[in-house]
């Protein structure tokens, strides 16, 4: 498993997101951990979609959809995809 950390702006604050690359028979996904605005740990996944894009799994926290493109950009920049 390969990992990297990226700081992403959420609202008015910067938060650290730790990305872990995982691969199985269904393909590649990234398991991501961070903390919410109350400093409670959260985790979620992004999976590869069409056109080499990355999408949140359905049912993710609503505020994550606002930074989905930044999360996808972080994966592309890491060159681990």
Show where each model-derived region lies:
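Compositionally biased, intrinsically disordered low-complexity segments
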Residues: 11-13, 28, 70, 78
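A short, structured beta-strand/loop element
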Residues: 22-52
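Negatively charged, low-complexity tracts enriched in Asp/Glu with abundant Ser/Thr
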Residues: 1-25
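Acidic, low-complexity intrinsically disordered segments
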Residues: 40-81
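Residue-level detector of functional hotspots within protein domains
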Residues: 3-5, 16-18, 30-32, 40, ...
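A mid-sequence interfacial segment
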Residues: 1, 12, 34-37, 77-81
């Amino acid at each position: 498993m390969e990992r990297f950390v990226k700081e992403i702006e959420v609202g008015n604050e910067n938060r650290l997101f730790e990305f872990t690359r995982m691969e199985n028979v269904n393909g590649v996904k990234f398991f991501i951990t961070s903390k919410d605005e109350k400093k409670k740990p959260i985790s979620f996944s992004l999976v590869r979609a069409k056109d080499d894009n990355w999408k949140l799994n359905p049912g993710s926290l609503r505020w994550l959809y606002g930074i989905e493109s930044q999360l996808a950009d972080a994966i592309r920049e890491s060159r681990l995809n």
